[in-house]
Amino acid sequence: MVVGKKKKEKIMENIKKAGSEEYETSWGDDGVPVSKKKSKVKQGKHSRAAGGRFELKVRKDLEAKGRIVDKWTNNVDLEECKVIMAKRKYNPFKKMLVVGTGFPDFISLKYIQKDSYSVIGVEVKMNGILSKIEKEKCVWYLKNKIFSDIWIAKKGEKRGSIEYMDF
């Protein structure tokens, strides 16, 4: 079997990463080893934890403002144009299913008057920037009148403050 020069270099680079103390090797979904820098893995853990704390803070803030808040566990299938149940993510190392994969993160209800409620979707983003797919989902939710508004919660200018932006 003849191996090309570029393929050989890539194989040697992967071998070097696997033996290095700087990299952590894990197995991907297709059974192929994936090398990640340990510093990036640590940074990802910190970012994910900070995002979870910020989500909890936003939820408490909305509840303090008199809104009923619940985790939204649905998502939009843009190809079929319908609301579907969000897929659970399985973590084989912790032997558990992660539920929080819906878009937006929360559904918020507030009584307005007899037989009238404000139904708002709340997406929590530390920087307040939505991806292209998330923007398309927001447009779909509003067009189909699933939510009356969609708020994007982001960190405010002052330490500890939260800003809500209308989509």
Where are the model-predicted features located?
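Catalytic phosphate/metal-binding cores of nucleic-acid and nucleotide-processing enzymes, i.e., regions
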Residues: 2-167
